[in-house]
């Protein structure tokens, strides 16, 4: 086997090399590949492994991360060369996943210790730390809203890849938001994280239901990523909500909701995303299932319900170049009161708008009192979108034309026959179709659609004509 293997990062602006240098590099790479292939099953041991450049990381934390390579439960030289290289690569990937290192290079030499075997290795992982303090200001586009924000992030706070962040933002719907978030890996595993979050948010709901909603709360959560690209999130939430700043036109139903409410809940969310592109996928699936149980615990509060919501999307390419794709989406939710009281306006589902049911005004589908939307406890929504390139525009550009059809509805669950609620939604759905232009960026997706409501109920507000949408979670 060779004396040394080394992985090195190079600057992107190096000058072009001549043909002789190219041939030399190709021959070296070919020779190295042949040596690795010939010795892939050779039993090797790791004499020493060390991480350099981690100046602000605790040695005890580094030792836990390196346990993948230094597994003392296995006998010496029980791994082949290929298995050892894969383990080293996996360990380096784990280091990078903590989001505290900028680069990591691997250097492998023959063991220099006099007590080491001929096929033992010395491994050095050279890392470069990211700045410990990061400050950012800018603008964001969320689901049908925009904001300006300032973020502060402190990395490696206690030397164990902890992250402490603070955020302040002001926007069109979320008038003011402040949050503090602390997260730390559990047992030096980047796939399992413990998070603590404290936040305050003032949301403007006047255009929908004649009030503002002030929310303050804390959340403790445990997040784990499994081997099948699934993400599990278990959270304990304690929230104080206030329906406030009612307008003079607020309906009696909204006025009855005015004031304070306290919610303690336990929630579980499973997410699996295999799409090749977040904004304009051409293949893959997206699944999100959320369960929330409110009203139990040391401080039960006045909210008591069981809430379930499912989101799913399937994308398939319709041609070999993947420039034409079909996307099918479905969402369904149910909310059941556990104390025989009406579920608070703060917790009900809302439906309608460019990111859910195109062709209808934002959150204006379902039960109402006068001009105020009251939300509901049961909903279904379906969407089919055909995306294809613009004429004379390169298919690699993030522009697409879109043909779509949406259907769905929002209502309230009836206790004697909850299934009948969904049958009623399916029998009289809100339906729209249309054509539009899609522009995708890494941060958000923008749509400009001409929409045509085909079917609507008496109270639901359809929008014929141009409708603009900006956000992340589109159907």
Swiss-Prot record:
KW Transmembrane (keyword) present: yes
Cited InterPro entries: Bac_surfAg_D15, D15-like, POTRA
Record flagged with keyword Membrane: yes
Keywords: Membrane, Mitochondrion, Mitochondrion outer membrane, Transmembrane, Transmembrane beta strand
The organism's place on the tree of life at top rank: Eukaryota
Topological type in the membrane: Multi-pass membrane protein
Major place of residence: mitochondrion
POTRA domain boundaries: 44-130
GO cellular component, one term: mitochondrion
GO biological process: one example: protein insertion into mitochondrial outer membrane
Location(s) in or outside the cell: Mitochondrion outer membrane
Record's function text: May be required for the assembly pathway of mitochondrial outer membrane proteins.
Entry text on domains: Its C-terminal part seems to contain many membrane-spanning sided beta-sheets, that have the potential to adopt a transmembrane beta-barrel type structure.
Subunit-structure text: Associates with the mitochondrial contact site and cristae organizing system (MICOS) complex (also known as MINOS or MitOS complex).
Family: Belongs to the SAM50/omp85 family.
Protein name per the record: SAM50-like protein SPAC17C9.06
Organism: Schizosaccharomyces pombe (strain 972 / ATCC 24843)
